Amino acid sequence: MPKPHVSSAVMTHPVRLAQAQDLATRLRLDGLALDPDPQGQPSALRTALVAWAAVAPGAGHHLVVQDDVDAPAELLEIVGRSAARFPDEALVFYTNWHARNGAAARLAALAGASWVRAVPDEFTPSLALCLPVEGAAAFRAYARDSAERHDDELLSAFFRGRGRMSLLAVPNVVEHIGTTSINDHAAQGIRLAACPTSAADAAPLLDRGRVLEEPGWIPYMRYGEGYVRLVGQENGADGGRGHHRWRDALPATGLTEEAVRAPRIPKDLATEVARTFGDAFAEELWIHCLLLGRQAARAARSLGPLPDGVPPDALERLRHSAVATAGPAGLPPERRPEAGPDEARAMTALAWAGVRAGESVG
């Protein structure tokens, strides 16, 4: 499989110029894409258009990385091999732990998949995104006259219009750093990867791992409560942006509350979580992970056998990574700093109990 030429750029603002230069040097990226109007109203799209125009002559694909990330030295190698495997796809290498797409990645990890199709009713994670050069040019033409400030929202609109959302790398080798935001996202609190993974594990998974095209309905959490992203909800009047509490969504999932409530929450594990975050959050995390386990078990049955060359131990570490982020990601943003090592261990133990209980539901 010949590796394509992938050019690259780091999106940045003058206030983070040194940080961006260090990132570009460490990762051997081609250069920086500076905000052309740094004194203007904050606009990620304005800088993104510069970044997507920075395609090197002869490149077949172009990678745009934002300046507030960390990644291993192997990033370009991993991206290049992924582009060779999926030459016509938009490939996303970071997924937010608290978003619907993060929940899709978490579900896919538990199912044993290495890639998952992004949902159409949410922004496209754009901290590390690779496009075929034709796609980069088409996006620039599409976005050039837009009044939208957020490139991630416009990318989703662009992909929806083309009838194919991006592919999310389930193992995340790219990590967001810090909570400051030039584009007013700091209120979302600590924002990290859904499934952080080492380059050594990610490389074979992304090279040969399975693709989950349709995960079905997707459980996710926001502000300490459980929700379900329903199949086809993007066709609603609000474009699918509404949020369905898990109880309200059950009829559309084919499950009953009686079935969901049948497994008993482990009191000792719930008490440990509730000690810091309250009984209500402990119960919501339990239900969320139970639904996650149920859907992951269903998805796993649709994936077929594990391909040759996919290390089972790497897949198992990916599963553990996915479950470990479920609790902290599900907390309200203002409570996430309270999740120290002991609290994280307690949430992970309860999350795993929920996932395992859910595997036999429905």
Language model segments and positions:
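Peripheral/terminal regions associated with large enzymatic or DNA-binding modules
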Residues: 2-65, 69-362
